[in-house]
Curated annotation (Swiss-Prot):
Stated name of the protein: Membrane protein insertase YidC
Location of region: Disordered: 44-78
Topology within the bilayer: Multi-pass membrane protein
Top-level taxonomic group: Bacteria
Any single GO BP term: protein transport
TM region positions: 4-24, 363-383, 434-454, 508-528
Cell compartment(s), UniProt: Cell inner membrane
Keyword Cell inner membrane: yes
Keyword hit for Aminoacyl-tRNA synthetase: no
Amino acid sequence: MDKKALLALVLSAAVLLIYQIFIYKTTPPPKPVNENKSNTVVVNPAAPVSPQTPADEPSSGSAANPETAAALPVDGTEKEQEITVDTPLYQAVFTTKGGALKSFALKNYRETLAVNSKPIELVDVKEAMPYPLGISFPASSVDVSPASFFKADVPAIDLKSTSESRRLTFVQTWPGKIKIEKIYTFNPGKYAIDLEIRTYNLSEVPLSQEIALFWNQYVDPSAKEDSYGHTGPVSYVAKDVEREKVTKMETPKSLGPDVSWGGFESKYFIAAMIPQNPSLTSLSLSKDSSNMVSTSLKGPKNIIPPGQAGFFTYKLFLGPKDYNILKAQGVGLENAIDFGSWLKWLAMPLLLSLKFLYNYVHNYGIAIIILTILIKILFWPLGNKSYKSMKEMQKLQPKMLELREKYKNDKARLSQETMALYKAYKVNPMGGCLPMIIQIPVFFGLYKALLYAIELRHSPFFLWIQDLSAKDPYYITPIIMGATMFLQQKMTPVSGDPTQAKIMLWMPVIFTFMFLNFPSGLVIYWLFNNILSIGQQYYINKQA
């Protein structure tokens, strides 16, 4: 491969890399809700409503018009109470206000590397904002306010020293209208939480009901946006991941049906609501003037006969974007890791290989180096073929220069004579290029795997590199990487074109500046790949 082909290859790789980093952030157009599909379901008679005191006896009268129903009254004398759920993985704080979630701190993940750093908090709401996991009943006979107070059946739950699951039940009754129960089930060793919502019709007329489960999150408009990760609403609709950029949320949007899950994500963590029946579930997104972003799952419309109950079942996942943990949920939640649509089939096995190596060396930096060596061994024959082809092309440079001078005014003849020269010396001009092109998808797959792997977050390597997911604080590895790239360029067969030679010499400088802010785990991969390539190039040159 001559210098021109190599230049085109390197520039193409650079363009792809820049595209992946700075441009590949767009979200596909949302799938609109199918308005023609019926979402109305008649609930089969369930367990009868439990006996009531005289004060709770149903009153006569027709149910309110679903389109004009107001929220049920809120008892202003109630005081908010907090219920703490403590497990080995997280500490959650629920509130009687809405039977919702007030705090969810992940014990195994910290905000920074500082010794006194706080655990990662998945809930962020400001004063007067409704908490996540609140419910409402839009277009129903009756609705509830997010400020409605529930009664909790226990003051706290401690699961740190047990393997048994526990329940937390919130209940509230509006006499003669409706009784609502929210039942959370916690498992000590899991991030997943089961949620069942039961609504009992206490009236004497059928109750038309359509439930919506919310995740509300405050997004600071002044916060610096992460160039490598998305923070905002995310959902899985009709087997496609939908991401909404918060800064572009101007009007409410609806997605679905066929919503497998929806929620809020950051680069490494996610809070997802998973409905029992995705085919009848739609999703709504909105942002208000106080920068509260709301994601709501809307279920099918139910008709609940008098004295009967409706049941709505969900699973909640609040935790890290660990591929194995997400995949175990069985609803495609692993797709929340942004490997990219055309790279995930390479990124996923590479990430799993990295985790496999870590089980033996217990250092992700070393695991990256070993994986780099294994990939280089896998592509060693292709690399040899590429370097040998470049060497053969270098030998033909004097003859090619003669042809260019001789036929400088006849491009057709120049092309014809050049191909004849290749044929005479049995040289394939693409022989050095194709083996390298085959390796490019593997590089980008590993790039994606390292960029979004939570395993690298706060994971130390050696000496000054204490977080493989963060940039090198002293820029030492990017500079060394640039030096190895410069050395590799010097060892590459030279071109007779001085302009191309100058451009190639600038490539290490460009890549060095690009890598200054890259996660150090990525830089380590590229650095050691360069070192191995230099060794292979030296071996080929010596053999020649």
